[in-house]
Structures are given as C-alpha cells and as structure tokens.
Amino acid sequence: MITGPTSGLGTGFARRYAIDGHDLVLAARDVERLERLAAELHDEAGASVEVLPADLAIAADRAKVADRLASGVRILVNNAGFGTSGEFWTADFQSLQSQLDVNVTAVMQLTHAALPPMLEAGTGTVINVASVAGLLPGRGSTYSASKAWVIAFSEGLANGLGGTGVGVHALCPGFVRTEFHERAGIDMAGTPSFLWLDVADVVRDCLADVAKDHVVIVPGLQYKVLTTGGRMVPRNLVRAMTKVVRRGRGRT
C-alpha cells in the first residue's frame, strides 16, 4: 500500500513497485488522479491496482485505510504528508492540526494496523517518508517537528522489531522536484540547483538502502554530507546554516 501516490515520491514508488511486479493498493483523496494513475499502471506494467479514496486528515478515512491494512499487505509506504507556508503564529490552527493528523497520526495509525499481519507472516516492510527537515532545524517548526517524530518513531520500531523479519525505515529526502512546495505555497526561488533531487533517484536509493536494512535513509551525497555535519557541530551553528540555505522560504 502507498499513501499519497498521485504525485511526487508517491507516484515514483507506485511506478517502481508496479514495474517490479507488485500488486498495489493506492490511497489518496484525489479520486480522479487516483483512478487515472491506477489505469496507467495497469496499462504500462500490467499491475493489479486497488484504489482506496481517503483523506488522511479525516479520522473516519484513516480508520478505513487502517481496516484495509489489517487484512494484510507486504509493504506499506506512508508517503502522504504536506507542509504549509507562513509563520506558525499567524497560520490557521486547523491547517496546522490537519498537518499533524496526516504527517503524524496517520503514520502511527496505519503502521499500527499493518504490523500485526506482517509479524504473523514473518515478513514485511514499512517505509515512512520523513525529511531532512526532521534531522536539521529550520524555519518549518511544525513540519520539521512532525518529520522528526517520524524518524524517532521509525528508529524505535526498527529496534523493537529486530529479528522478526519485519523492517521499518525512515526515508529522509531533501528538496525533491515534485509539486510539494508549490502546493504548500512555499517560494523556492533561488534554491541552489545542487540541492535538488529527482524522484526516480530518491526511490532507487531508498529501495537499495531498504535491501541493506538501513533504518534512516538519506538520499543524495549532498544531503549525507549536510546531515552528517549537522550531527558533528553545535546546534546553534546548524540553525545558523539552515537559515542561510532556507532564507525566504517560509514554512510552518
């Protein structure tokens, strides 16, 4: 199952898994795009695709997806997530709450539903899409915090699941060429070109590291350098560096 498959990394994972011969369950709120993607994957790769319309900001829809996961899947990609623009103190509170419902609550609830049948089968993979923003402090207070939670959650589960045949991984990409920033209303003008990653490369690197049983996965040499350096220098210096890199790109 892949959540948020109708654009960006979600589409990248869906296409890769379809090409690799997997049957898919795709959950997203945009029904038209969801059905169009399902048809494309069937025509291009012969994949059997089950569509599950759901808005993960809504409790009833999260429960519907969790019920489907409880019947068993081999792989869960918790990809759905979003950011918002502007400052925390002026942002609409309901938008902030919806962000946490999707970025945190849905990840926890869907993983909780998926693990029991995986453990019973003795095999399974959960990929939680986090972000470099969860490893490095930045302007995005609630977004960064939500992704830091995903990383800590994934690492804790991975430790607890050792030896079971079930793996949990946190994918931490940097800036990826997707609709993410445009949808959030975040101005990315002036972002250095070397910081941008391609969807196909991120998916490829992620699955390669999953096969190596890496838990925290950071695609791209540039981001490996940034995150490794961020762990070695004082936090106040890291904050100063991220202010320079992300200047003018307000995110909440």
Regions found by a protein language model. Give the residues of each.
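Conserved glycine-rich Rossmann-like NAD(P)H-binding loop of the short-chain dehydrogenase/reductase
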Residues: G21-L37
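Active-site helix of classical SDR
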Residues: T111, S146
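Conserved NAD(P)H cofactor-binding loop of Rossmann-fold oxidoreductase domains
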Residues: N79-T84
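Conserved glycine-rich cofactor-binding loop
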Residues: T6-S7
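Residue(s) in the substrate-gating loop at a strand-loop-helix junction
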Residues: S131
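Substrate-binding pocket helix/loop in short-chain dehydrogenase/reductase
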Residues: E87-S98
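C-terminal helical subdomain
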Residues: A170, G190-L226
